[in-house]
């Protein structure tokens, strides 16, 4: 209104009441009326001032205030009338420019006049502009030099004058120039072709406006002028007419801001990268390091690359050539840089001459030397010199040492500092050492170009890390040198990296580097050795304190003894370990080999790069790694990254360098790489710093082993430090896993050497530090308690490919080295360390990735690379490749070898070994957690007692994880071990097989009888377990029915080729393992194996007798103490989140009763999630799982009398036959007890069937973890994300465990597994595992009713069964049936089976494995409130339990179950599980 009124008031001359536009006209002495007239058309919005806004909008600077702000840049605004007073000078000045341009660049000057004319034509002031142009041409002699009172000498004069003028008069207007120059600048800005005909939408003054406004106005005139000018200027610059370009540019002083704008705009637009002409004015990040405006358009078009090249590339070239030629590249790079500078200088639009700018740049360079950067813009990425860094600084003198020490160690330090103050201390030490490593990394940053493969990068963890010493040693010095000086160049790179001073410095550096390279290679070798020694010493010092904490000799023994054992073990069982260790090993060994390697590295850099590339390709180069994560990335980002990759394959080298920079420097010099990034992306003013989070040019080929976070500057993302390390390990672990076969020998050597340095990886280094440095365990004990929940989560998140491997490898090493007597202490140490590590790691990881996405990344990076790399991560895209079939085969072979070799020695640790490294860690962590957290409960002690043996196995677990479940096989899980081995080797396929074997075993031990029949089935092992849990089993026996025993036996052996094989193996392993004191013979439940396959976990081994071992499956992390069944069960439950995951089967009968005590154990949901994820992936990977289920499941189903859970567990034994008799947990197997009874689909299966979204079983395990309610909370959430989607993420990834916890914190007590996130598309029965842990604490679902729990699901595919949801608590059923009714509970669980119409097992009953823990039915009472399922449904559960078992997962139809389900009200039967929905429903069918 006002606008309309105002305009009306003003008159119809088009001048609005708003005098801003009219002011322009007044100032100009022109009538902007025409322009306004065009704008004047008033629409309805105009009354709102929209039109006025539009009018004003065209030239933001049209406002008087803006005018004053941006003087004379608005082509439409002639502040001073053209009386010539002020403008005459400017016109004359423009004339000099035009004339100069005409003379020097006739094309440009002419285009400018033409453009100006076009602009003037467009503009009202066309005539005046034309006149000005004309006048300018005649007045051409007038230049800024004249304005400055200096001889014009169009080129020389202007240039000279510009040189004389340290700054543009425009920039620093004088009173004299104010009238003339300033106004001239204004008018010329106004006349500036770049501004276009109408009111300039851009800032009036480029100079004042960062040149953002000064950039070409997006108008035809400006564009044409820009291209023309660009062409001419670039031509002049390129032609070596920088003087002309500069002169012409300089001579159009007023235009210079504009021309810079033009040039910047057109070039910026054309190339998407136009360093601000007034880089001095612009923030460093805004300006390209070089005022590359002067760069040729061609150069500029490639400028983004050149910039990468310039900063990284020059170093890279230097180093490439240094590597190869040593000098050629530096020369080339230098030429590029000087070229840029020259071009930059010459065409530099700023009034100041290139030389002046250089002078300024030199000043800036001086300023750059400071941490504040060129324009006093703080270079936050600049590594500040701190006392801690002083050593690094001194090392920086050595160049490579500084960065070498800085990066890896600092990464580690960062990880460790997060992990532990002790670790932080160590980190400080290592920070220095890491500087060396990072220096290598940094150098590698440069090196990668010589090693063109970004694979170098992605082999980074292993390759670059080891190459750090090799090439890194070489390049470290250079890189350190370069980076020493280069950080300012990077900044300058942002601002005016091209300044001659910087160039000279760089040349000097390059020359020095070349000269010093030889000595530095030698020095690097020596220094690397020193650094490695330092790292080792620091690690040993830390380790010694840490082991002193528990086992001082352990760290040395582990480090020294473990490497020998770990060497073979690492090679076989711990591909990841070699990887994780390898980088450090590279560093450590490389110091020795560094001189040779460094030199040969330059020569054999490509060969090294090749092998590393191979390994990296397998493990996933950063690009691949990112490809993996690119899924996480928005498509546009992926696309952009791909495009960038394509655009910048040259840059890819640089980018590798760049990524290396970013990756490595992300830690110590994140800003420099960051700056490099910023300069690259930021150089476009539109740069979104968030891109900094991503590798500047993510190479899709580079596997996202390095989490995007890794690319985030550590400053930007905390995880940048930790995660990048993790990715390194992931790269190393993954790549070296692949490399383990390729590079294992050297890696192993290195590993042996750098066994401890492996902790370099942030998660891993941190974990390794924790594992090895046992200082952590103490802090970690507290952390374990505090972080117990998260302990596994971090470990799970990180353990996979990264964190888990390092600690796990360390654990494994530890176990291997001191598997026997030391096992308990080691184990406890490890456990303490691991939980703590995990806690810290997860905390770190969560800090880094608070989002599920972050966790998913971590999980994928760690879990997928590590745990899943072998098993489920093989499914993971990034790591499927990493763990190629060949690799998997190798791993499996190694596993089997290890298995066989370790069967006896690894009995105790075989369990853990089966567990994926992170699970092993989790187990250790859980056991530790239990030890620390649940010491009050017998669980903790027993876990320690019982788990110690198993946990030590976990130490080897990494190997086992690597080598399937080699150790696992040896222990009772021996059966699982081999089965798991196959499963792991198959990484899911085997999982089914393993599940089958597990199914058989589980069926034998746990299936129908839970652990009852295992006596018969398992024979000695079961008998032993039986002894432990026989009393409990006695309860179950009655319930499990001997007939079921026989059935289970036959079935257990009958599970199928794999199942039988594994059953036999399990039997063997069980017998052998059960012979172990606390051996987790119980792994009999295939579930454990099942879980093992995905998350090869030693049988849950709750300490329950092997029979109870049914549970043991779930605690993939359970160490499987078989000791006191109940205590063990509690231990396992308490200490094994994984157990709880699958344990919904906790053997609700007796064990769950004891397990009620178990409840205290809070399993980090991450562990469960991890397992579930693993299981899910395994499930996805191995359709055979259903086959397992079929053999095992058939047996189970055949044995309906057995606890349905058991029977279902057998069915479910596809889970490894977690034989969920106690595991009514909504077993993933939807059909087994579709009614839910035997179905207790044991969301363990969720783990097993990682891809199966119904990971509710995690929730079930959560029941137990629920006992540690908060901790357990995590798991349920894992349910919430569709597990399919989360499969890779693993629940932990997809859903931050903490989130899961949060989700379930509300559900905390029950953590009802019934709460299946709708996204868990096929989470058949959302078993409110609360039942398992539902023990009294959880039995009391917080007021949440099953419906509530389910309701979150109501939106989800499976409709929350109305009241009928019958989140039957096994507890409830258990109450009614008593623990013995546990089977009934299983049956009842089917009641829980809510028609999950859409869930894979459509109705997979939300079986509340409460019965598992509900033995007393205590949970029941608590669950009673939640007992949304009508009591009637409970009874049906019993029926279902017996009858559903026969169902045998027949397509998971409830047809069989239906008989039972009818009462179950859940109506799971109506919803025969959609087999399709079941991950492998068909497979499930017998």
UniProtKB/Swiss-Prot annotation:
Compositional bias of kind Low complexity: 600-611, 638-656, 998-1007, 1410-1421
PANTHER family named in the record: BAT2 HLA-B-ASSOCIATED TRANSCRIPT 2, PROTEIN PRRC2B
Region (Disordered): 1-20, 39-306, 320-341, 385-519, 531-658, 792-847, 893-918, 950-1080, 1177-1205, 1410-1443, 1455-1486
Lineage: Eukaryota, Metazoa, Chordata, Craniata, Vertebrata
Positions carrying Phosphoserine: 166, 168, 222, 226, 387, 415, 479, 555, 621, 762, 793, 1070, 1159
Cross-link annotation Glycyl lysine isopeptide (Lys-Gly) (interchain with G-Cter in SUMO2), location: 251, 751
Biased composition (Polar residues): 88-137, 219-235, 288-300, 960-986, 1181-1191, 1457-1474
Assigned keywords, A-Z: Coiled coil, Isopeptide bond, Phosphoprotein, Ubl conjugation
Modified positions (Phosphothreonine) in chain numbering: 228, 753
The gene coding this protein: Prrc2b
Coiled coil, from the record: 494-544, 880-904
Biased composition (Basic and acidic residues): 422-433, 478-488, 501-519, 1025-1055, 1062-1074
GO biological process: in utero embryonic development
Amino-acid biosynthesis in keyword set: no
Protein name (Swiss-Prot/TrEMBL): Protein PRRC2B
């Amino acid at each position: 209104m006002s606008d309309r009124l105002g305009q009306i008031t003003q008159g119809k001359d088009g001048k609005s009441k708003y005098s801003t536009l009219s002011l322009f006209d007044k100032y100009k002495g022109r009538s902007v009326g025409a322009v306004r007239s065009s704008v004047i058309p008033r629409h309805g919005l105009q009354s709102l001032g929209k039109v006025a806004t539009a009018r004003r909008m065209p030239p933001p600077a049209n406002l008087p205030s803006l005018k004053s702000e941006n003087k004379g840049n608005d082509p439409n605004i002639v502040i001073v009338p053209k009386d010539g007073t002020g403008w005459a000078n400017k016109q004359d000045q423009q004339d000099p420019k035009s004339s100069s341009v005409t003379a020097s660049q006739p094309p440009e000057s002419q285009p400018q006049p033409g453009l100006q004319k076009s602009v003037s034509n467009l503009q009202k002031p066309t005539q005046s502009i034309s006149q000005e142009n004309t006048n300018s041409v005649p007045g051409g002699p007038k230049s800024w030099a004249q304005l400055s009172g200096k001889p014009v000498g169009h080129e020389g004069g202007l240039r000279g004058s510009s040189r004389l003028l340290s700054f543009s008069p425009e920039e620093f207007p004088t009173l004299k120039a104010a009238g003339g120059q300033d106004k001239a600048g204004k008018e010329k800005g106004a006349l500036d072709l770049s501004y276009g005909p109408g009111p300039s939408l851009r800032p009036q003054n480029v100079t004042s406006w960062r040149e953002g406004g000064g950039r070409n106005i997006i108008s035809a005139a400006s564009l044409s002028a820009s291209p023309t000018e660009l062409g001419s200027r670039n031509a002049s610059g390129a032609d070596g007419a920088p003087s002309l370009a500069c002169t012409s540019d300089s001579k159009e002083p007023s235009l210079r801001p504009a021309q810079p704008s033009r040039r910047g705009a057109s070039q910026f637009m054309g190339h998407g990268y136009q360093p601000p002409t007034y880089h001095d004015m612009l923030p460093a990040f805004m300006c390209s390091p070089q005022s590359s405006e002067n760069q040729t358009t061609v150069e500029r078009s490639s400028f983004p690359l050149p910039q990468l090249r310039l900063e990284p590339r020059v170093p890279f070239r230097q180093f490439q050539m240094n590597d190869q030629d040593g000098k050629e590249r530096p020369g080339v790079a230098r030429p590029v840089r000087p070229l840029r500078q020259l071009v930059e200088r010459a065409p530099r639009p700023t009034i100041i001459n290139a030389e002046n700018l250089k002078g300024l740049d030199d000043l800036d360079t001086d300023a750059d030397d400071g941490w504040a950067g060129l324009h006093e813009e703080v270079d936050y990425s600049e590594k500040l010199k701190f006392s801690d860094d002083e050593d690094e600084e001194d090392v920086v003198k050595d160049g490579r040492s500084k960065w070498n020490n800085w990066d890896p160690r600092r990464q580690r330090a960062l990880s460790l500092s997060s992990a532990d103050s002790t670790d932080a201390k160590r980190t400080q030490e290592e920070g220095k050492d890491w500087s060396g490593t990072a220096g290598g990394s940094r150098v590698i940053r440069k090196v990668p170009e010589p090693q063109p493969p970004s694979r170098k990068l992605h082999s980074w963890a292993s390759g670059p890390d080891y190459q750090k010493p090799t090439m890194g040693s070489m390049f470290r010095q250079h890189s350190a040198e370069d980076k020493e000086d280069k950080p300012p160049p990077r900044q300058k790179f942002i601002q005016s990296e091209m300044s001659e001073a910087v160039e000279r410095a760089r040349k000097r550096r390059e020359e020095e580097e070349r000269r010093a390279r030889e000595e530095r290679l030698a020095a690097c070798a020596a220094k690397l050795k020193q650094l490695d020694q330092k790292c080792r010493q620091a690690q040993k010092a830390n380790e010694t304190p840490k082991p002193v904490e528990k086992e001082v000799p352990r760290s040395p023994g582990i480090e020294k003894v473990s490497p020998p054992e770990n060497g073979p073990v690492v090679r076989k069982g711990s591909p990841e370990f070699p990887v994780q260790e390898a980088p450090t090993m590279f560093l450590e060994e490389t110091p020795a080999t560094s001189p040779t390697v460094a030199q040969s590295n330059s020569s054999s850099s490509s060969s090294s790069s090749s092998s590393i590339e191979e390994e990296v390709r397998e493990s996933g180069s950063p690009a691949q790694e990112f490809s993996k994560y690119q899924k996480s990335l928005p498509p546009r980002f992926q696309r952009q990254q791909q495009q960038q990759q394509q655009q910048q394959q040259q840059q890819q080298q640089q980018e590798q360098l760049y990524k290396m920079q970013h990756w490595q420097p992300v830690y110590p010099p994140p800003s420099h790489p960051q700056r490099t990034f910023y300069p690259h992306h930021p150089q476009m003013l539109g740069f979104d710093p968030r891109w900094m989070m991503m590798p500047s040019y993510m190479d899709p080929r580079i596997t996202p082993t390095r989490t995007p976070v890794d690319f985030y500057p550590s400053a930007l993302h905390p995880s940048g430090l930790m995660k990048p390390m993790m990715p390194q390990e992931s790269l190393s672990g993954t790549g070296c896993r692949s490399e383990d076969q390729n590079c294992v020998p050297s890696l192993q050597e290195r590993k042996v050497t750098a066994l401890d340095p492996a902790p370099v990886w942030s998660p891993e280094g941190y974990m390794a530090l924790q594992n090895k440095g046992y200082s952590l365990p103490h802090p970690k004990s507290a952390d374990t308690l505090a972080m117990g929940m998260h302990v596994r989560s971090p470990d799970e998140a990180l353990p996979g490919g990264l964190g888990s491997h390092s600690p796990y490898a360390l654990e494994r090493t530890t176990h291997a080295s001191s598997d026997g007597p030391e096992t308990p202490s080691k184990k406890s140490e490890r456990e303490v360390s691991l939980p703590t590590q995990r806690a810290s790691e997860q905390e770190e990881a969560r800090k880094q990735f608070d989002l599920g996405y972050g966790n998913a990344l971590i999980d994928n990076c760690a879990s997928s690379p590590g745990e899943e790399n072998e098993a489920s991560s093989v499914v993971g895209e990034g790591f499927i490749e990493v763990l190629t079939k060949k690799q998997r085969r190798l791993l499996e072979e190694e596993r089997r070898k290890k298995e066989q070799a370790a069967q006896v020695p690894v009995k105790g640790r075989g369990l853990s070994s089966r567990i994926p490294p992170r699970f092993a860690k989790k187990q250790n962590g859980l056991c530790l957690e239990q030890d620390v957290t649940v010491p009050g409960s017998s669980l903790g002690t027993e876990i320690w007692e019982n788990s110690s043996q198993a946990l030590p196995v976990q130490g080897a677990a990494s190997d086992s994880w690597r080598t399937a479940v080699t150790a696992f096989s040896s222990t009772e899980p021996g059966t699982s071990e081999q089965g798991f081995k196959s499963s792991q080797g198959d990484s899911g396929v085997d999982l089914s097989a393993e599940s089958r074997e597990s199914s058989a075993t589980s069926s034998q031990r746990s299936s129908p009888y839970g652990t009852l029949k295992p006596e018969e089935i398992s024979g000695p092992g079961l008998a032993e377990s039986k002894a432990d849990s026989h009393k409990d089993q006695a309860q179950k026996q009655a319930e499990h029915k001997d007939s079921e025993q026989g059935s289970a036996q036959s079935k257990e052996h009958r599970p199928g080729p794999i199942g039988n094989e594994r059953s036999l193996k399990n039997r063997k392993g069980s017998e052998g393992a059960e012979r172990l004191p606390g051996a987790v013979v119980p792994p009999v439940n295939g579930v454990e194996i099942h879980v093992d396959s995905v998350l090869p976990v030693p049988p849950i081994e709750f300490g329950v007798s092997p029979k109870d071992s049914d549970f043991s499956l779930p605690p993939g992390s359970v160490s499987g103490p078989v000791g006191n069944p109940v205590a063990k069960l509690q231990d396992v439950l308490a200490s094994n989140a994984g157990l709880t995951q699958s344990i919904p089967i906790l053997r609700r009968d007796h064990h769950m009763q004891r397990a009620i005590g178990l409840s205290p154990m809070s399993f980090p949901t991450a562990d469960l999630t991890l397992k579930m994820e693993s299981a899910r992936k395994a499930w996805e990977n191995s359709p055979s799982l259903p086959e397992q289920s079929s053999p095992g499941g058939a047996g189970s189903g055949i044995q309906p009398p057995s606890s349905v859970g058991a029977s279902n567990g057998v069915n479910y034994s596809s889970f490894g036959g977690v034989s969920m008799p106690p595991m009514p947990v909504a077993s993933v197997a939807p059909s087994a007890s579709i009614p839910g009874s035997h179905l207790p689909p044991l969301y363990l299966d969720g783990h097993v069937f990682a891809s199966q979204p119904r990971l509710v079983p995690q929730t079930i395990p959560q029941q137990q973890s629920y006992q540690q309610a908060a901790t357990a909370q995590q798991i349920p959430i894992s349910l919430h994300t569709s597990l399919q989607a989360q499969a890779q993420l693993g629940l932990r990834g997809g859903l931050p465990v903490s989130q899961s916890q949060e989700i379930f914190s509300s559900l905390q007590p029950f953590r009802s597994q019934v709460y299946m996130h709708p996204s868990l598309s096929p989470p058949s029965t959302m078993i409110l595992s609360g039942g398992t842990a539902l023990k009294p604490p959880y039995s009391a679902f917080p007021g949440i009713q099953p419906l509530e729990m389910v309701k979150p699901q109501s939106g989800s595919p499976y409709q929350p069964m109305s009241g009928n949801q019958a989140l039957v608590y096994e507890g409830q059923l258990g109450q009614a049936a008593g623990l013995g009714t546990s089977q009934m509970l299983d049956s009842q669980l089917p009641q829980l089976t809510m028609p999950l119409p859409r869930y894979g097992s459509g109705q997979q009953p939300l079986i509340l494995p409460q019965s598992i823990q509900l033995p007393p039915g205590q949970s029941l009472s608590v669950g009673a409130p939640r007992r949304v399922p009508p009591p009637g449904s409970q009874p049906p559960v019993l029926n279902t339990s017996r009858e559903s078992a026969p169902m045998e997962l027949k397509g998971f139809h409830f047809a069989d179950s239906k008989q039972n389900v009818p009462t179950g009200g859940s109506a799971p039967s109506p919803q025969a599980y959609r087999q399709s929905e079941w991950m492998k429903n068909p497979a499930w069918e017998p």
